[in-house]
Amino acid sequence: MAPRLVLASQSPRRRELLAQLGLALEIRPADTDERVLPGEPPRDYVLRVAREKARAVPGDLVLAADTAVVLGGEVLGKPRDADDARRMLRALSGTRHEVLTAVCVRRNASALGVELDAVVATEVAFARLGDAEIDWYVGTGEPLDKAGAYAIQGSGGAFVEEVRGSVSNVVGLPLAETAALLRRAGFPLPWERP
């Protein structure tokens, strides 16, 4: 019997994406410090946070992830408030930016355990936004708990002109890469089980 998969996240988006793969989950959010360290490159940042989340939660098979929007080398995390969301959306307006997600799978099936990870990058082209669009969008409340202050799977998708790479990565979890990591960790996916 396959071990129960523990998701070290409170993200409803990650839960929904994993449900698309037919995976039953136990949700145990990790309590970790998600601040960017001084001088920390964006790839190193998301990988460090995903690993810390996976290590902070007990379980035989733990999956954790961290997503960041990166513009000009700056990590845009979740906005502190509505004004910060407006600032981020103005900065993203009319630009191409990168969405990075690090996924970490930790398995404690042996004395040594196994930790596998991957970082996936997706390029997103954003429409030019005026103040009226930004104010309306911030007023919906949707951007306030999203990295980079937008949700491609929600109303914010209206501002996305082009995506190069994994769309599920922009939502918060690259499904193809996550499935590959689970397989490598010895976790059979629903269609691989007898």
UniProtKB/Swiss-Prot annotation:
Keywords: Cytoplasm, Hydrolase, Nucleotide metabolism. It is found in: Cytoplasm. GO terms for cellular component: cytoplasm. One of its GO terms (biological process) is nucleotide metabolic process. Its EC number is 3.6.1.9. InterPro entries: ITPase-like_fam (IPR029001), Maf-like (IPR003697). It is an enzyme of class 3 (hydrolase). One of its GO terms (molecular function) is UTP diphosphatase activity. The record marks 13, 67, 153 as: Important for substrate specificity. The active site is at 66 (proton acceptor). It holds the Pfam family Maf. It catalyses: dTTP + H2O = dTMP + diphosphate + H(+); UTP + H2O = UMP + diphosphate + H(+). Its cofactor is a divalent metal cation. PANTHER family: BIFUNCTIONAL DTTP/UTP PYROPHOSPHATASE/METHYLTRANSFERASE PROTEIN-RELATED, BIFUNCTIONAL DTTP_UTP PYROPHOSPHATASE_METHYLTRANSFERASE PROTEIN-RELATED. Belongs to the Maf family. YhdE subfamily. NCBIfam families: maf (TIGR00172). Nucleoside triphosphate pyrophosphatase that hydrolyzes dTTP and UTP. May have a dual role in cell division arrest and in preventing the incorporation of modified nucleotides into cellular nucleic acids. This is dTTP/UTP pyrophosphatase. The lineage of its organism: Bacteria, Pseudomonadati, Myxococcota, Myxococcia, Myxococcales.
